[in-house]
Amino acid sequence: MVLLIIGGYTSIPKLDKQFFPTPEINQIEIRMEFRGASPREVEEQISVRIEEAIHDLNGIEELRSTSREGVGVVFVEVETDYPTQKLTNDINTRVDAIRSFPSDAERPTVTEITYRHQMGRVQIYGDLSEREMKELGEILRDELVRQPWVSIVELQTARPYEVSIEVSEDSLQRYQLTFDQVTTAVRSASVNLPAGAVQRDSGDLLIQTRGQAYDRADFESIVLRSDVSGQELLLSDVATVRDTFEDIDVDIEFNGKRSLGLNVYVTTSPDVILTTNTVKAWVAERELSLPEGVSLEFWQDPSKSFKERVRTLVSNGLGGLVLVIIVLMLFLRPMLAFWVSVGIVVAYMGTLFLLPYTGQGLNMISLFAFLLTLGIVVDDAIIVGESVHSAQSRGLSGVHGALVGTRQVVKPVVFAVISTMVFFAPMFFLPGEWGPASKGIPVVVCLALAFSLIESLLILPSHLAHMKPEPAIPDSGWLTRTRMACAGWLARFANERYRPFLEKCLRNHASVGGFFLVLLCLSLALFGGGYLKSAFFPRVNSDFVVGTVELPQGGAFADSQAMRDRLVTAAEAIKTDYNSQSRYQQTPAIDNILGVAGANKVDLLVQTVSDDLDTEEMTKRLRQSLGDLSQAKDVRFDYTIRDPGKPISLLFASDSISDLEVLSQDVRAALERYPGVFDITDSFDAPLEELVLSLKPAAEALGITLSDVAKQIRQAFYGEEVQRIPRDGEDVRVMIRYPEAERRAIANINSMYIRTRDGAEVPFSTVATYRVETGYQSIERLDRLRTLEVSADVAEDGAPPRGIVESVLRNDGPVWLQRYPGLTINMDGELQEEIEFQQAMVYMGSLSMLVIFGLMAIAFKSYWQPFLVLTAVPFGLMGAIFGHWLLGWQVSMFSIMGVIACAGVVVNDNLVLIDRINNLRDEGMDLLDALLQGATDRFRPIILTSVTTFVGLVPIMLETSVQAQFLIPMVVSLSFGVMFATGVTLVLVPALYLLGDDVGKYLTLVTKREIERSDRDVTPPLV
């Protein structure tokens, strides 16, 4: 015991400490840039070619691709248990073999996606230019990444450097130049080239050419051409050279000032406390040496939430432990209660001792599992301790009494632990995002139960063997008097109240069975009738309010900046209002405000500090203060830990994009029929206008091809990459193109000239034309088919989202499948996760019950008694439903996990009871007397195990902090399920036992009569 305690204590520093466990990401990303290309072109030239090259590889579960302007990304979902590194190598081989990629595209990169633990963000903000801000950010990044416990530091949304050589159409005509000539001149002059070595006797002398241009002055001095008189035409005479940033629309403000973020990550062995403390210390020290007017702020600190949740779980766990000890002290001898309580510590320390070797650490899931097992691990010790105490009370000596008492319950205790483990086993195999993260629960539970079994069967009896008999004249102290009174009351209640009541129930056992069946049906009707609200993931308030406003495609960047300023101003006003209130004088309600303006999109992030701030109410105020946002295409605000997206989401796949375009209108019309459905959007909602070029007949006579026109248009508007220069740790692109003003207007296409191969200049309008077509912002594909996603929101008083989706699929789905050949329809989003989760739980829960049924059948040598053991499971579900209804909680995925946990607990009492009844019958006792005596004998341990499980969870069930809200549904399911199932164990199980005996007697009688009848019908042989 001492070794387990020491081992557990020394293992704590070895455990990873993080907010949530590391998820398993079995994905590979193939990314390829094709700058300046439209989504449709990226799809055809990049995404489709990659998909066709790799789709038949072994190990691929699913292929998804996204084609956006200038980049194509293909995501490969790897099959479970297939080696990801092997598939990555196979994909690399296939992709490298593709020779049909566009020549202007970048090389594809194939990356195995690994999870990185974000440990917060350091925000740099102040009165600096964008270049000064980035230069400072790069210095701070390099310093911070060298700190201990820090793996990766990334600059957030910092625009890459770029050298832009801008040549106007007028300059090209004035100097009779083409983009190709300027490009060739720059490439020829800006170069570093090793030229070998002069092999001298004294040693080699390296020959180097150093003409690489690195900054604006270097490029401006490049000679484009010179005449015979020596007069030179410099690049500065023809073009404007701008040493600037890539043309990306992004502008970040933090607390009203220009800002840049440093994201801090840890890749392996995360320790949220050590890492964040290191970063905080570095920030405090480094801020002292920053330029005037520049500040650092460490925020989005995960250690804050981690500490708060650890504090909540530990305090509630200790509170539950105290309540458990109090309950034990009220009914058991102090020494017995003490050693039973020590069993909890031993089980926990043993679990901590082995936990590092299971791949689990200390996080919200594993800590909650410890809390969950608080009332479970004590059950074995209570049953063994009570049995030993009873044996010793009958006059058996200490050691002999301990052996006899332990042997009497060893079978039900062992099978109870095994059955509980089997019921928790499905959590090892849960699908979806939360599957791998939930493994901490069964790992902790199984380890704790294993050590609890060792402690209760080996360690506890050895302690109880030396417990002195209770004195004939008990101590007159208040504790003894209280314990004797409680124990006496419980014994009298069992004999004088419970036993007569049970006898009446047994004489009317059929009616008792019908009564419990009605209760079960009532609870199922309560759930199925919609009286209980459900949500796959409970909405739990976060420390942040996140706002996103999407503007119409093609709008000016100034519109995004104006919208960002509008959101920030509204947030600042609310911040001032809240922080001026008296209750927030010590701790402000709102701290930091981040506003990001991007291309047609604005993001707002508001950090709350005070625990008692209602972020839901604050979000409503923020939304109302913004007023009319009709000019926005989409507005979303979220204040929860996990944004589930819209509750209705349907995914359609087809090889015909025209079919999907028409289908999008059909789906909208179908959803609009349901009351309460609003804000219907689809992935074709955001059209992107495209200019499509075509040649005129005159072009052929001039020898101009469509390729010539396309290339020169690309050079003018997107630009041509001349070279890349290494500078300040990154590759800087050097681009030649039109000035920004000429690239902003469509009319400039008509005014530009196309150069022929013989040097002639022809107006664009003479040889080509263009038309405006509607394209897409992005094109999504699933398993080599284009997809359409339609999503919608549902009002609180509307129909359940799942019911709406199922109705649409049932009524409209067959029509769409017939109308659009090759169409596939799937649920998507949280609804799909919910269905997969429920199906997995039903399947694996049923499998667990079959396994337990088989184990019980072997143990009891009966097929009826295992059924009696498992009757507790549906009635545990009944208790969970009534618990959610009484306390007003939504049924969520955690509620279902609580029901599974409850199932593993409630069968234990049935096992103990049935085993005792069987022993009494083996001793020759009449069935009715055995039922009454066995239930009375096991009344105290059954009540104690149920009450300790319940009271151990009461503190977390009554917790009001945000940190506990998403765990309470599981606690409600377990605690109320155990309490309701206790009544089933003490009343229904004996009644069903008797009913089974009646059925057995009836079947025996019927069989006997059939045998007698068949014997009479046999014709006697002729003599």
Where are these regions (language model features)?
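Extracytoplasmic/periplasmic
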Residues: 6-100, 105-108, 130-157, 534-607, ...
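Flexible hinge/switch segments at interdomain interfaces of large molecular machines
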Residues: 17-28, 64-70, 105-126, 154-160, ...
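Helix-loop junctions and hydrophobic alpha-helical segments within the transmembrane domains
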Residues: 299, 306, 310, 385, ...
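Transmembrane alpha-helices and their membrane-interface boundaries in multi-pass membrane transporters
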Residues: 374-388, 410-429, 436-484, 604, ...
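Short helix-loop junctions at transmembrane helix boundaries
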Residues: 18-21, 302, 352-368, 428-445, ...
